[in-house]
């Protein structure tokens, strides 16, 4: 238990993913990012074309394995790289790139099942969209949830439909709520992704997104900073002056405010975002990940604050 917050080690003031995993498994857990070779429904014409305007050619899997290689090969290569830094640990296989339930169940099984048989794999994390959860897929996920440690990561990005339309998400909020409900019916852990710094969004709008997530039946959150990569459709918006990058100070203050309204039990899987430096358009300060994390820690300490301090349910209890 931390000095300031019950769901953290040492001086952390928010519910870290690392804390959660070490408490659950008693050791270091690596998240091994894989590319299952999927597409997205707003890229392939199922619901739209072009994809999300912020999304890279790698489908937001810029640090995932090589999709040209079999899943087992990707897994072993990334595992070996991780063990160059850490000597021991077990693994969560993370299907990160594109939409990882956008295929028939038979295809999903071909992708997921082999990696679950790898030595040391204790769980599975699947990144997808709320409009790619048909009943048969949810039933398969429910079955997986009975035999491995499962998370489904659902991209929300923003609760504001005007922004969602601008970035070509091609789904509405009701679809998101429905997706969460389908998964939670089977007690599947859900991690919601949000992005700070989207075009046209101000502080109040970004806080509204965090406050809405705080009310959802989701067990985790990933807070991303919008970082612009070369080759993404959003570069054109940036060149037209439709996008301004957040400063590090503004981002730090916003994230601390967002943490304060989240329930303390909600696991914070990520609290910033970065991309390959050779593809980065901006903001360049985001590549210094540890500095960003340290500034968030320092600001929470300066405020004598912590995750959930302003959460209504936490205050009432």
Positions of the model-derived regions?
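Auxiliary Fe-S-binding modules of radical SAM enzymes
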Residues: 2-19, 28-30, 220, 228-317
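Conserved non-cysteine loop/helix-boundary elements of the Radical SAM core domain that shape
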Residues: 61-69, 97-110, 124-186, 196-216, ...
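Structural recognition of alpha->loop->beta junctions
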Residues: 52, 114-121, 208-222, 292-307
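Short catalytic/ligand-binding loop motif for oxyanion handling, primarily in non-cytosolic enzymes
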Residues: 41-42, 63-64, 102-103, 276-280
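N-terminal [4Fe-4S]-dependent radical SAM core
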Residues: 1-92
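Hydrophobic faces of well-ordered beta-strands that scaffold small-molecule active sites
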Residues: 30-34, 91-93, 124-126, 150-154, ...
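A contiguous, low-structure linker/loop signature
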Residues: 77-118, 123
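A structural motif corresponding to the C-terminal end of an alpha-helix
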Residues: 118-121, 179-190, 216, 254-266
């Amino acid at each position: 238990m931390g000095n300031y917050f019950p769901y953290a080690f040492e001086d952390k003031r928010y519910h870290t993913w690392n804390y959660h995993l070490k408490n659950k498994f008693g050791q270091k857990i690596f998240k091994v990012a894989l590319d299952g070779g999927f597409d997205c429904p707003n890229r392939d014409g199922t619901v739209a074309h072009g994809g999300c305007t912020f999304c890279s050619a790698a489908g937001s899997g810029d640090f995932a394995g090589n999709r040209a290689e079999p899943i087992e090969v990707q897994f072993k290569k990334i595992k070996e790289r991780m063990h160059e830094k850490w000597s021991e640990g077990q693994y969560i296989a993370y299907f990160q790139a594109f939409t990882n339930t956008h295929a028939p169940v038979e295809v999903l099984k071909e992708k997921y099942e082999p990696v679950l048989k790898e030595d040391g794999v204790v769980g599975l994390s699947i990144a997808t969209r709320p409009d790619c959860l048909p009943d048969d897929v949810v039933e398969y996920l429910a079955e997986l949830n009975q035999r491995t440690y499962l998370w489904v990561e659902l991209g929300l990005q923003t609760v504001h439909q005007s922004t969602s339309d601008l970035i070509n998400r091609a789904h509405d909020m009701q679809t998101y709520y429905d997706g969460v409900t389908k998964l939670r019916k089977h007690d599947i852990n859900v991690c919601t992704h949000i992005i700070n710094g989207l075009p046209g969004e101000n502080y109040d709008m970004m806080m509204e997104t965090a406050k809405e997530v705080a009310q959802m039946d989701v067990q985790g959150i990933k807070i991303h900073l919008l970082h612009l990569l070369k080759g993404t459709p959003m570069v054109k918006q940036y060149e037209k002056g439709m996008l301004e990058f957040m400063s590090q100070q503004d981002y730090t203050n916003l994230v601390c405010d967002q943490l304060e309204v989240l329930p303390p039990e909600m696991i914070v899987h990520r609290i910033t975002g970065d991309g390959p430096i050779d593809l980065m358009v901006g903001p360049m300060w985001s590549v210094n990940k540890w500095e960003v994390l340290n500034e968030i820690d320092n600001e929470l300490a300066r405020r004598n604050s912590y995750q959930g301090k302003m959460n209504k349910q936490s205050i009432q209890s």
